[in-house]
UniProtKB/Swiss-Prot annotation:
Origin species: Methanopyrus kandleri (strain AV19 / DSM 6324 / JCM 9639 / NBRC 100938)
Cellular component aspect of the GO annotation: ribonucleoprotein complex; ribosome
Protein name: Large ribosomal subunit protein eL33
InterPro entries: Ribosomal_eL33, Ribosomal_eL33_CS, Ribosomal_eL33_sf, Transl_B-barrel_sf
Gene: rpl35ae
Keywords for this protein: Ribonucleoprotein, Ribosomal protein
């Protein structure tokens, strides 16, 4: 059985003139390197709205940088209130 990890949404995936609310950069606790983050690719991520309880699911698609952050693609775009909130990894 896999352990549940908690992470924090750092930001949307951004370009010079655009941002993509469907893809987010997330840092998980205990993940400190690119190789550790690469082991999370393909796993499911769940964000739950703190007030309404609405759930948006996503999937880890790639690493981001060399310090353990990952890029997650969600099924729907996340609201701006989601930035800085917690997600769980299954």
């Amino acid at each position: 059985m896999s352990e549940v990890k908690r992470g924090v949404i750092v930001n949307y995936r951004m370009g010079r003139h655009t941002q993509d609310p469907r893809q987010c950069i997330i840092e998980f606790e205990g993940v400190e390197s690119r190789s550790e983050a690469a082991q999370l690719i393909g796993k499911e991520v769940i964000w739950k709205h703190p007030e309404t309880g609405k759930v948006i699911r996503g999937k880890v698609v790639d690493t981001h940088g060399n310090n353990g952050a990952v890029r997650v693609r969600f099924e729907r775009g996340l609201p701006g209130q989601a930035l800085g909130t917690e997600v769980t990894l299954k």
